[in-house]
Amino acid sequence: MYIKMATLANGQADNASLSTNGLGSSPGSAGHMNGLSHSPGNPSTIPMKDHDAIKLFIGQIPRNLDEKDLKPLFEEFGKIYELTVLKDRFTGMHKGCAFLTYCERESALKAQSALHEQKTLPGMNRPIQVKPADSESRGGSSCLRQPPSQDRKLFVGMLNKQQSEDDVRRLFEAFGNIEECTILRGPDGNSKGCAFVKYSSHAEAQAAINALHGSQTMPGASSSLVVKFADTDKERTMRRMQQMAGQMGMFNPMAIPFGAYGAYAQALMQQQAALMASVAQGGYLNPMAAFAAAQMQQMAALNMNGLAAAPMTPTSGGSTPPGITAPAVPSIPSPIGVNGFTGLPPQANGQPAAEAVFANGIHPYPAQSPTAADPLQQAYAGVQQYAGPAAYPAAYGQISQAFPQPPPMIPQQQREGPEGCNLLIYHLPQEFGDAELMQMFLPFGFVSFDNPASAQTAIQAMNGFQIGMKRLKVQLKRPKDANRPY
């Protein structure tokens, strides 16, 4: 990543700078940058620095402090050769860190010894970091070189929640020099029963693991003490990516190549069976789980490339689902057609739709049109043909009267709805296509509706709906003459 640098200006070139920096410049010169003095008729003079001078990384700096504010803090340890605050290349925003180089190596050693994790600057939660920059650590400055943090930082779990940092230090100090000891706490300030301990060397950390991991059970802990190396940044990133991939797989099963569809569909149906089993035990399924179950049911209804999905068995409150086998269906009728798109049938392979699944013996109620009485019911009303009473068994009992049906669908040859019925959707995942859009908006008619009421209902329910790491933005399509001033 390219980082824009903002470099310290050591003051204007005037008489004061002459006495402070010892470098001559005329009163009319433009300024003094990084120890360079400029005179109208003289070449620039570069201050000397030791051949083994150390470039320091400074972290945990308040973002409102620039070079001139930081200079007095570091000047007391020696003459500064260069001080640079890191800023974002595009936004120019302060990154909260800087690079510092002294003219003399000893000045860097003194600054690190006096400041590193010894002082917390105003507005910061952690003490200032003063250590060699990565390039220096890989180079010849061996006296300041340290092993990577992940090789000597330990995660400690199953602690007594009453233990403090001092208690943890006493437990681990027998194995070496402890640089950091931090107990993880919740928003209320109470301990979570785990901590991070950083040693000065990898060997010390390994010795602590060998001696303490599983060696004892702390009072109030459910199992023995856990001592292991903390996850690296790369491992944490990989775990987050796996979680994101799992979310995308749940909300976008159509993105999976159809060559391996059979095994994937079978796994989906196993997940659906588990969801429905939980319904049978608890009698209620939250809206997100109901939506996931509906997608699984739709996937089961697809018969792509001659591959048959695994059969689904209805689950009741007091029985275990038996195994059912059914022949593949070569073709499935298409009961729903919207704007030329073929709808997804609710049944496949002779299996009953999810209305046949009972929750603790509660029989399904007829699905109703969305009403203003329950916003969540509006959002998932169209899913009821698949999720049935599993989503809202209580709401079905309260709403028993019939509601008028919406006007008939627009003719298939019309590709765009009338004014006020067309939606513009932002932030869709790149792999989304027509099939995914239809699957997502089918409960409301489709993206292009035949009446403004359905369009407004879809906007209220789906605007802000999260898919993976994206949130949908749904709004009315602008009229064609919206940009005209008259």
Curated annotation (Swiss-Prot):
InterPro entries: CELF3/4/5/6_RRM1 (IPR034648), Nucleotide-bd_a/b_plait_sf (IPR012677), RBD_domain_sf (IPR035979), RRM_dom (IPR000504)
UniProt keyword annotation of Protein transport present: no
Domain RRM: 54-135, 152-232, 406-479
Annotated stretches, region: Necessary for TNNT2 exon 5 inclusion: 239-258
Superkingdom of the source species: Eukaryota
Record-annotated disulphide pairs: none
Alphabetic keyword roster: Activator, Cytoplasm, mRNA processing, mRNA splicing, Nucleus, Repeat, RNA-binding
GO cellular component: cytoplasm; nucleoplasm; nucleus; postsynapse
Gene3D superfamilies (UniProt xref): 3.30.70.330
CDD domains xrefs: RRM1_CELF3_4_5_6 (cd12632), RRM2_CELF3_4_5_6 (cd12635)
Recorded GO MF terms: BRE binding; mRNA binding; pre-mRNA binding
Sufficient for RNA-binding and MSE-dependent splicing activity as annotated region, ranges: 1-298
Region of interest (Disordered), residue spans: 18-39, 121-149
SMART domains, sorted: RRM
Main subcellular location of this protein, as a coarse class: nucleus
Location in the cell: Nucleus; Cytoplasm
Polar residues: bias regions: 18-28, 138-149
Biological process annotations from GO: alternative mRNA splicing, via spliceosome; excitatory postsynaptic potential; in utero embryonic development; mRNA splice site recognition; negative regulation of excitatory postsynaptic potential; negative regulation of mRNA splicing, via spliceosome; positive regulation of mRNA splicing, via spliceosome; regulation of alternative mRNA splicing, via spliceosome
Tissue: Expressed strongly in skeletal muscle, heart and adipose tissue (at protein level). Expressed in the brain and cerebellum.
Family: Belongs to the CELF/BRUNOL family.
Function: RNA-binding protein implicated in the regulation of pre-mRNA alternative splicing. Mediates exon inclusion and/or exclusion in pre-mRNA that are subject to tissue-specific and developmentally regulated alternative splicing. Specifically activates exon 5 inclusion of cardiac isoforms of TNNT2 during heart remodeling at the juvenile to adult transition. Promotes exclusion of both the smooth muscle (SM) and non-muscle (NM) exons in actinin pre-mRNAs. Activates the splicing of MAPT/Tau exon 10.
Protein name: CUGBP Elav-like family member 4
